[in-house]
Amino acid sequence: MMDNVHHGTEHHTPMNSSELVGPQDNAAHLEHATHQIHNTPFSALLTAAMLFFGISACALFFLSIQHAAHAGWSVIVTRVMEAVSSFIPVGGIILLILTFLNVGGIAHLYHWMDPDLTNPNSPNFDVILYEKSKFLNIPFYVVRILIYVIGSWFFVWKIKKVSKRLDETKDRKDYKALYNWSVGYIAFFGFASAAWAWDFLMSIDPHWYSTLYIWYSMVSTLSLSL
């Protein structure tokens, strides 16, 4: 019966993976591999910079909690936490450089930056990225990165400055100022640490999202900073 059905028609079942692809596929795979090799240094730098920037920001967050709570025991670790948080400017500069390398097209860590993906007339149009483009667009993204870096840089500079001055003057006014700036950083960190986890890390794959990701990111770096 089967011989009658297939009579006159030759069927060939691929025996291995090499028969499933053609020369055009090899070219596409080569392009993809080249793209990955090109991005490897940038992805490694982003991972390291984000890790240590997060640790230093969490160290300042922990220190600010002690100042806001008027804790006395933390005086023995104050200078240690301030030293750890001193990496914020360095990590911030590295993250800014990576941001502008991606915006300039030198690095390609964030494929949502490709304008073709949000252009309805493009053959590469992605409806999911189009819907997210109100948040994931280059101008707004750069503004947010600047807020994270400059804001964290300002708070670590200000808190360390007031803390050092308080050691010298023992002035109640400086004590109150240290409290106020610490409370300000706690509020800033609460919003910024969530948003920079989205921007620097989760937006690498903008089709995937998790409501718990920001907590994993913050708690991981906070535990490391301690």
Language model segments and positions:
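Low-complexity, proline/glycine-enriched hydrophobic segments characteristic of transmembrane helices
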Residues: 2-40, 117-123
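Loop-to-helix transition at the N-terminal end of transmembrane alpha-helices
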Residues: 37-54, 79-82, 212-218
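Long, contiguous internal "core" modules enriched in hydrophobic/ aromatic residues
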Residues: 43, 132, 137-226
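Central hydrophobic cores of alpha-helical transmembrane segments in multi-pass inner-membrane proteins
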Residues: 53-71, 152-156, 160
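Flexible loop linkers connecting adjacent transmembrane helices
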Residues: 68-83
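Intramembrane catalytic core of multi-pass membrane enzymes that act on lipidic substrates
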Residues: 84, 88-158
